[in-house]
A protein has these predicted regions:
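A short, gly/pro- and small-residue-rich
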Residues: 106-108, 207
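A generic structural micro-feature
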Residues: 75-77, 98, 202
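Catalytic-pocket segment enriched in acidic/His residues
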Residues: 2-24, 39, 45-47, 115-224
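Extended, compositionally biased flexible segments
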Residues: 1-89
Length: 224
């Protein structure tokens, strides 16, 4: 079976049998803000004392090769490569230990952000919620030690971000537990665990690639 491919019903393309795509429309996409100290510093923000999180709409999801569309409402759109976690079983008020067994897999996520609108608005829904603002890759169902996951972002082939889960302010199990004490996490939900330093604007004609090294990848052209 290794190396064989099958038709992906969501995109019409081929994907390896060792990977999966998430549901086309997850119930929710939970994103963690400022979970890498250096990223918080580069934006002039304090490191949070407890996890800061927000939601992206499922309509923001796109897949491999789909275009990130720059909206006319923004003059500064930036990439944010992240390690995403796909939930496999229901989590409500879960302990950190219990969250690990509930993970279906890990997934590359680009939390595309209209930075000027994020600074302008009192909350982040508009800045984070445009159609095409959440590219996601394949799900890797075998991923090893969560703390050793590494995310890399490349723009036009040049590395712009690199971050390890070991450098996160809050660990992945802690994040899942924390969120589950606020809202139930259901199968298919995605939790994006924050972006490392190095975020920067993207422009029409760029190609942005986010990879969880050796596990999941998504590459998208930019238009608009």
């Amino acid at each position: 079976m290794a190396g064989m491919k099958f038709d992906d019903p969501l995109t019409g393309g081929d994907i390896p049998v060792s990977t999966e795509h998430p549901v086309a429309r997850p119930g929710k996409i939970v994103c963690i803000g400022r979970n890498y100290r250096e990223h918080a510093k580069e934006l002039g923000n304090d490191v949070p004392v407890e996890p800061l999180f927000f939601l992206k709409p499922s309509t923001s999801i796109i897949y491999e090769g789909d275009a990130i569309v720059l909206p006319p409402q923004s003059e500064r759109v930036e990439f944010e490569g992240e390690i995403g976690i796909v939930i496999g079983s229901r989590l409500t008020k879960a302990s950190e230990e219990a969250t690990v067994d509930a993970i279906r897999g890990v997934i590359a996520v680009n939390d595309v952000t209209a930075r000027d609108l994020q600074k302008k608005d009192s909350q982040w829904t508009r800045a984070k919620g445009f159609d095409s603002f959440c590219p996601i890759g394949n799900i890797a169902t075998e991923f090893g030690d969560l703390s050793q996951l590494t995310v890399v972002t490349r723009v036009n082939g040049e590395e712009r971000q690199r971050g390890s889960a070991s450098d996160m302010v809050f660990s992945i199990p802690m994040l899942l537990s924390y969120v589950s004490h606020v809202m139930t996490l259901e199968p298919g939900d995605i939790v994006a665990t924050g972006t490392p330093s190095g975020v920067a604007p993207i422009s029409d004609g760029d190609v942005v690639e986010v990879e969880i090294i050796g596990l999941s990848k998504v590459s998208n052209p930019v238009t608009g």
